[in-house]
């Protein structure tokens, strides 16, 4: 399955929330696409609810099925609560960290910046969006890329104290992962236990 490149508003309406950020269309049409107005919804099966939650997580973080499954299997064998570890692994992806640091306005934009070699890890260019950032590593912007409009606009006025597990040096345009985020540090509205139940069948 290829990465979804269609209208983000359609996906946001599917889940009934702005999983890609603020969505003006969602405020007007807060019901799934294909449904005419707020008519009575059919009751979704237990499997359907679990599958929906997995899809929401995949769309939110821009991860394909094979990548998502691999992350789940890694989380399942790690210490800790499987669902929380899964979210921590998703949060630790380089594209997500670039987004959380405010270097890019969206995760999709962050993926592009990483893929196009605008981002460094510990001073070395890394162009793999799924690269797993470790505590203590420094995430920066290449010197020649610091003037890019998308980066400058995204960083302008960004609140870098939003996430306690990250810090940012405005002068050098370098961020640091202080520690792995706790579940309370992750603002995404994802019921990770449903994903664990789905994969445990």
Curated annotation (Swiss-Prot):
Database matches in Pfam families: Ribosomal_S4 (PF00163), S4 (PF01479)
Residue span, S4 RNA-binding domain: 92-155
Gene: rpsD
HAMAP family for the chain: Ribosomal_uS4_B
Protein name: Small ribosomal subunit protein uS4
Keyword match Repeat: no
Organism of origin: Bacteroides thetaiotaomicron (strain ATCC 29148 / DSM 2079 / JCM 5827 / CCUG 10774 / NCTC 10582 / VPI-5482 / E50)
InterPro entries xref list: Ribosomal_uS4 (IPR022801), Ribosomal_uS4_bac-type (IPR005709), Ribosomal_uS4_CS (IPR018079), Ribosomal_uS4_N (IPR001912), S4_RNA-bd (IPR002942), S4_RNA-bd_sf (IPR036986)
Subunit structure: Part of the 30S ribosomal subunit. Contacts protein S5. The interaction surface between S4 and S5 is involved in control of translational fidelity.
GO biological process, one term: translation
GO molecular function: rRNA binding; structural constituent of ribosome
Keyword field contains Endoplasmic reticulum: no
Family that this chain belongs to: Belongs to the universal ribosomal protein uS4 family.
Annotated spans, Disordered: 26-48
UniProt keywords, alphabetically: Ribonucleoprotein, Ribosomal protein, RNA-binding, rRNA-binding
């Amino acid at each position: 399955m290829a990465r979804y490149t269609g209208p983000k508003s359609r996906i946001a309406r599917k889940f009934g929330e702005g999983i890609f950020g603020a969505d003006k269309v969602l405020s007007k049409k807060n019901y799934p696409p294909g449904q005419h107005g707020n008519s009575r919804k059919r009751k979704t099966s237990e499997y359907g609810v679990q599958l929906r939650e997995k899809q929401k997580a995949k769309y939110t973080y821009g991860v394909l099925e094979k990548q998502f499954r691999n992350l789940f299997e890694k989380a399942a064998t790690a210490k800790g609560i499987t669902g929380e570890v899964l979210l921590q692994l998703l949060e630790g992806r380089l594209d997500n960290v670039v987004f959380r640091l405010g270097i890019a306005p969206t995760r999709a934009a962050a993926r592009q910046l990483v893929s196009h070699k605008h981002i460094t890890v510990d001073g070395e260019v890394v162009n793999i969006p799924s690269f797993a950032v470790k505590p203590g590593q420094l995430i920066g912007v290449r010197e020649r890329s610091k003037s890019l409009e998308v980066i400058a606009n995204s960083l302008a006025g960004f609140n870098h104290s939003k996430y306690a597990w990250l810090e940012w040096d405005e002068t050098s345009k370098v961020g640091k992962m202080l520690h792995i985020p706790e579940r309370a540090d992750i603002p995404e509205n994802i019921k990770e236990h449903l994903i664990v139940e789905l994969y445990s069948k």
